Design a protein with these regions (language model features):
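Active-site anion-handling motifs in enzyme catalytic cores
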Residues: 1-308
Length: 308
């Protein structure tokens, strides 16, 4: 029997990464794993949620020494757009596992962008020594192939879930997150389209990670209210299963976060994506979702595509 350590963006109450952890833990349990340990920013909560071992993010060394396999992923761990320090951390976990002779599996990640030369060199070396590499999109596979690294192309882990397809008429979901270039002008233009198209429907504003999403969701609710739309609800404190349930109930979703759009696709909900990150653009291209840019001033064509 095999022992596993999982390295990911776990314990931050981010819906997408917690949903991935949920899928991954279930897969490892189904394989008959002897021991599963998640590296987490909130080990106590992680252990409670998943029923497995958990260690703090800066105290993973002993867990790696005792394990057989390190699983890195999923999500977008290996990129330096968020920060170079973040890339170094996740690579550091991989390098520790390699140093102690452990197998390393890269699990369905979106790789890049990695803009720094040092970051590219360190990532190439780490992945060339991994036992198995799988990625969640074609462009990540092409990047790794250009580095001489074989990578298996698989769906994002959320696509493995059997999600309900209720698609109730009359409910529109809007999922926003804070972002430096998400400004008042964009929110007002978005609100104008929603008022124009969906004034007869219930609007649900979905906060996936309250520390990042909630303030902008509440701000957008106020903007909609000023424009005369009062059938608006802000949903916060959502668990992974809450999100699956809420999105599957929707008729339409306007989604900013990558995994909001993934869940909509999997649940058969018509979605319009907001492009704040290259991973969202890749997903929209792959699944033919209408896509609006944060600098865009007219969304009528994209809303026509959503409704049509």
């Amino acid at each position: 029997m095999t022992k596993y350590v999982v390295s990911g963006y776990i314990g931050f109450d981010n819906f997408g990464d917690e949903a991935i952890a949920h899928v991954l833990v279930d897969k490892l349990k189904a394989k008959g794993a002897e021991k599963i340990t998640l590296i987490s920013s909130n080990p106590e909560k992680t252990t409670s949620l998943y029923g497995v071992n958990s260690v703090p993010m800066l105290k993973f060394l002993e867990a790696i020494k005792e394990t057989d396999v390190l699983v890195s992923g999923g999500g977008s761990l290996l990129q330096d757009v968020t920060s170079f320090k973040s890339l170094l951390y996740y690579l550091g976990v991989i390098y520790c596992a390699l140093f102690f002779g452990k197998k390393v599996e890269i699990f369905r990640q979106g790789i890049g962008p990695i803009n720094s030369k040092v970051g590219q060199i360190l990532t190439k070396f780490a992945l060339k020594h991994a036992s198995r590499v799988s990625v969640r999109d074609k462009k990540s596979q092409e990047l790794l192939n250009s580095w001489g690294i074989e990578a298996e192309l698989l769906n994002d882990p959320i696509f493995d879930l059997d999600l309900p397809k209720k698609n109730k008429k009359g409910v529109v979901g809007v999922q926003l997150r804070n972002y430096p270039t998400l400004n008042e002008a964009f929110l007002n233009t978005l609100a104008d389209e929603i008022v124009k198209r969906f004034s007869d429907k219930k609007i649900q504003l979905l906060s996936f990670q309250d520390s990042i999403d909630l303030a902008v969701c509440e701000k957008f609710a106020r903007i909609l209210s000023k424009k005369g739309l009062n059938n608006v609800e802000v949903l916060k404190g959502l668990s992974v299963n809450d999100v699956f349930e809420k999105i599957s109930d929707l008729e339409f979703l306007i989604g900013m976060r990558f995994h909001a759009n993934v869940v909509a696709i999997k649940s058969g909900v018509k979605a319009l994506a907001i492009n704040y990150d290259i991973k969202v653009k890749k997903l929209a291209e792959e699944y033919d979702l209408p896509l609006v840019e944060l600098k865009q001033k007219d969304f009528s064509k994209e809303f026509d595509a959503l409704i049509g």
